[in-house]
Swiss-Prot record:
GO biological process, one term: enzyme-directed rRNA pseudouridine synthesis
Similarity annotation: Belongs to the pseudouridine synthase RluA family.
UniProt protein name: Uncharacterized RNA pseudouridine synthase HI_0042
UniProt keyword Isomerase, yes or no: yes
């Protein structure tokens, strides 16, 4: 399987991870990193952050230990700005704003958003209607909690389209419609901005959806 390399630097690469590929610490993680290393003809690559198995889009892989340490610092200091796109067929309680609250483990591997704010997950978002019963969400996480965006969307009453863990009636949906579309950060005094549009999934390629994604890219939303 060929992994799409979206951006290449002497210290790191950014790939477009396909939906359905796990990067967590199981047997598949080693497979992903080994596959990329083999493709690049390098001894090893370092995973410096994660995407859920159901999420597609931009993923940074360091090419040396020093770069991995630098990215660890950047992520811990919240200096890497991430933007995600999501789709939902449910109307949200509010169309834009801030979703904030502590996250607590629920049943069957799921998480839930709490009213408390001791160590909260924070997400800025905006949304726009693509067509009846289909809405595009632009999500900007300010923290990096497990399942943060999926839980945030559920808390709005708009679970992500196709999300079998947090939504309902997902059997006929071909994927979970969450995509990491943009990364922006300073790396050793160089500003890096990478954008990757979603293409994997029947709803991403709908003209009404693609049009609204293009509008977002050319006309800044409040949270951008």
């Amino acid at each position: 399987m060929e992994i799409e390399v979206v951006y290449q630097h002497s210290d790191f690469i950014i790939i477009n991870k396909s939906e359905g590929i796990s990067v967590h610490k199981d047997q598949e993680e080693q497979g992903l990193t080994e596959l990329v290393a083999k493709q690049l003809n390098v001894p090893k690559v370092w995973l410096v952050h994660r995407l859920d198995k159901v999420t597609s889009g931009l993923l940074i892989l360091a090419l040396n230990a020093e770069s991995a340490a630098e990215f660890s610092r950047l992520f811990s200091e919240h200096k890497i700005h991430k933007t995600y796109l999501a789709l939902s067929n449910q109307k949200p309680k509010k169309k834009q704003g801030l979703i904030i609250g502590d996250m607590k483990k629920a049943r069957e591997g799921a998480w839930k958003l709490c009213q408390t704010k001791d160590n909260p997950a924070i997400t800025r978002f905006e949304s726009v209607s693509c067509e009846p019963n289909l809405r595009l969400f632009i999500l900007k996480p300010q923290t990096g909690k497990t399942h943060q965006l999926r839980v945030a969307m559920k808390s709005l009453g708009s679970p992500i389209l196709g999300d079998g863990l947090y939504g309902k009636n997902t059997e006929k949906i071909d994927r979970t419609y969450l995509h990491a579309t943009q990364l922006e950060f300073d790396y050793l005094n160089n500003f890096i901005s990478v954008t990757c549009l979603p293409s994997q999934g029947q709803f991403w390629i709908k003209p009404t959806v693609f049009e609204q994604i293009q509008v977002y890219l050319t006309k800044p939303f409040l949270s951008k």
